[in-house]
Amino acid sequence: MKLSRRSFMKANAVAAAAAAAGLSVPGVARAVVGQQEAIKWDKAPCRFCGTGCGVLVGTQQGRVVACQGDPDAPVNRGLNCIKGYFLPKIMYGKDRLTQPLLRMKNGKYDKEGEFTPITWDQAFDVMEEKFKTALKEKGPESIGMFGSGQWTIWEGYAASKLFKAGFRSNNIDPNARHCMASAVVGFMRTFGMDEPMGCYDDIEQADAFVLWGANMAEMHPILWSRITNSRLSNQNVTVAVLSTYQHRSFELADNGIIFTPQSDLVILNYIANYIIQNNAINQDFFSKHVNLRKGATDIGYGLRPTHPLEKAAKNPGSDASEPMSFEDYKAFVAEYTLEKTAEMTGVPKDQLEQLAQLYADPNKKVISYWTMGFNQHTRGVWANNLVYNLHLLTGKISQPGCGPFSLTGQPSACGTAREVGTFAHRLPADMVVTNEKHRDICEKKWNIPSGTIPAKIGLHAVAQDRALKDGKLNVYWTMCTNNMQAGPNINEERMPGWRDPRNFIIVSDPYPTVSALAADLILPTAMWVEKEGAYGNAERRTQFWRQQVQAPGEAKSDLWQLVQFSRRFKTEEVWPEELLAKKPELRGKTLYEVLYATPEVSKFPVSELAEDQLNDESRELGFYRQKGLFEEYACFGRGHGHDLAPFDDYHKARVLRWPVVNGKETQWRYSEGNDPYVKAGEGYKFYGKPDGKAVIFALPFEPAAEAPDEEYDLWLSTGRVLEHWHTGSMTRRVPELHRAFPEAVLFIHPLDAKARDLRRGDKVKVVSRRGEVISIVETRGRNRPPQGLVYMPFFDAAQLVNKLTLDATDPLSKETDFKKCAVKLEKV
């Protein structure tokens, strides 16, 4: 084939444009590209939210050049959201980090020095000295790690092993503490096992969708497209949306409900009362499969013990409960009448009744969806428990088309943070550090001395901030997260500890984020398909991908960093003599040898990889590291209701939902005929509980930790927007996404703006008791707050909204309430 230079250039342009848009490449263009190097396509899960969309990644000449929705992926069926289409560009920001950077002055580390390029050996030298000094002088409780629901499964597993087994410190927590911890505790309290019982297949079979504090139109747009299709193609399908402000999901709602912040607890109890008063209980299900318990109340707000609210609490942090009778439960919810609920919530009575009728109608299959509106809540665990009550009263659970479903916001908040157990209190497969039997199981599988894993729960995310500020936590490693921007109360509780000269802060990240720039040492990190990985999404799907390109410069994966750093420590440097005496054969070995190069982990040869398959980590070692770690980890859940398939199956299949038993995935847990752990004749079995029964909790309304008053007269709610993901550290480096939403704005009701002499586009100072930021007034647009509330996204590093937020948490889950604090506005 002969082409002129002009035709050649034109064909190249056509090929590039088609690839970027996920379109088929025209024949002439395909032929021209083929003369250079054909685009190679391989599957991967999307890098962003917890939906778990499948994408096809196109690589050419060592770079990711295109991305399209995977038509064979059952989650998204070939469709991407706007962020998914621009995945290639998140990897190639102009300020991508390519070498370690240490604060230095006069050739040495200095807390006040300038960031200076160093080698990896030099970086590990400094880290080794800081870790060993802290461990020797103050012990394991003086070191900590803050990880991520964006870690791959084996990265989270490796991190947990290093800290809990190697360093003997449970001071490791993921950023999922800020988003999913309330869901975890809610699941564990009600069902005894974590994660949803249903799946996305419910969407096409449901009669009604109820969104509790979830703007799925922007935060889970692919799932929302499926709900939209269901609603618009079936006039009998109903959508109800509850929120403290109006957002894009309201555009589809048949019943759009705006309620006073914190009063969702009242609505939930009202619906339970309605179900009982209208004889809508599924008596057969209820009598066989449910227990009733009354929970402790007045449990505080997770603030420092010296805070007046904590001093005033009668049962601070109490998770206690006691059995109660049905008559007592009936009397408890009877207080939440229609009249009282309307008064406390500000919701019209007819809307409340319409909502309650959805749950009470035995012929309607209902799905309840929620995300941060429930979870980022000082009574987030209670909110989770109370929505489960509605499904347990009516038996609308664990069957196609109906059930409660907690959506996740990160790609592996489920698969890594929760299932692997990277929380400060957890171990793999729902085990916990406080349980001696669970610790014993881990120690035996890891072949480490009995008593190695501490029984004491480590510091959770907010407690880590406080310990850094107080000088109790002195070496702190943050990976795959931007908590300096994303965490609460930056001014009072985070920045002081990070910049305290007693402390040494390490941040591993691909970009110079707010967190990285506040650190002492920055480690350049490989991202997404620059490494082999695995994520677990919101519906228990585990998804694998292969390394498809190499990371730029000296950037290394989080797994590489963890494993290489472990070589710097011998067992006698981190374990006391009494432990070594139990396993003297481990004396003199490095943590690398004990944790990551065991016969169990290293038994899979690198020859299992295709000759042309990239896998920098495994080829460096000579064994298939990811496979070894995964198979060791997977053995914790097999036979215990958390069964994962063999490693190789995930590379062959698009996705598999656990438990995977005899090669078959599970769509609906806990019900006969769907779940292999429920025997014939049992009907339902909530086997996370010893008696196989789920729990309905009686839990009351309790007020927020901070509410508007005469001086700080507005509620502030924070969150996200469609175009940006979390702190924007990836999406703001995509020019198209940045242009679409270049800076954060303050969404405000027009009358609230007018009362303060503010107009759309004006600069405004937003002030709380903890800090202030300058933003831009927005009285129109996608988010429409009611009078008395303002909404501000947190993606903008130039407008750190978390200078304003309060570090109050749910006392049970330790998850921060980012949705409710009090602010005032000042015109600039």
Curated annotation (Swiss-Prot):
Q: What is this protein called?
A: Periplasmic nitrate reductase
A single Gene Ontology CC term: nitrate reductase complex
Instruction: Supply the Gene3D superfamilies for this chain.
Output: 2.40.40.20, 3.30.200.210, 3.40.50.740, Dimethylsulfoxide Reductase, domain 2
What does the record note about the cofactor?
Binds 1 [4Fe-4S] cluster. Binds 1 molybdenum-bis(molybdopterin guanine dinucleotide) (Mo-bis-MGD) cofactor per subunit.
Q: What does this protein do?
A: Catalytic subunit of the periplasmic nitrate reductase complex NapAB. Receives electrons from NapB and catalyzes the reduction of nitrate to nitrite.
The residues listed in the UniProt record as binding substrate, with positions renumbered to this chain, are: 794
Q: What is its EC number?
A: 1.9.6.1
- SS bond list: none
Assign the protein's first listed, main location to one coarse class.
periplasm
Question: What the entry says about post-translational processing?
Answer: Predicted to be exported by the Tat system. The position of the signal peptide cleavage has not been experimentally proven.
Q: What organism is the protein native to?
A: Shigella flexneri serotype 5b (strain 8401)
Compartments where found: Periplasm
GO terms, molecular function: 4 iron, 4 sulfur cluster binding; electron transfer activity; iron ion binding; molybdenum ion binding; molybdopterin cofactor binding; nitrate reductase (cytochrome) activity
- State the top-level EC class: oxidoreductase
The family database entries (InterPro entries) matched by this protein are listed as: Asp_de-COase-like_dom_sf, CT_Nitrate-R-NapA-like, MoPterin_dinucl-bd_dom, Mopterin_OxRdtase, Mopterin_OxRdtase_4Fe-4S_dom, MopterinOxRdtase_cofactor_BS, Periplasm_NO3_reductase_lsu, Prok_molybdopt-oxidoreductase
What Pfam families does this protein's entry cite? Answer: Molybdop_Fe4S4, Molybdopterin, Molydop_binding
Residues recorded as binding [4Fe-4S] cluster, renumbered to this chain, are: 46, 49, 53, 81
Quick one: which residues bind Mo-bis(molybdopterin guanine dinucleotide)? 83, 150, 175, 179, 212-219, 243-247, 262-264, 372, 376, 482, 508-509, 531, 558, 718-727, 802, 819
What gene, per UniProt, encodes this protein?
A: napA
**Catalytic activity, as annotated:** 2 Fe(II)-[cytochrome] + nitrate + 2 H(+) = 2 Fe(III)-[cytochrome] + nitrite + H2O
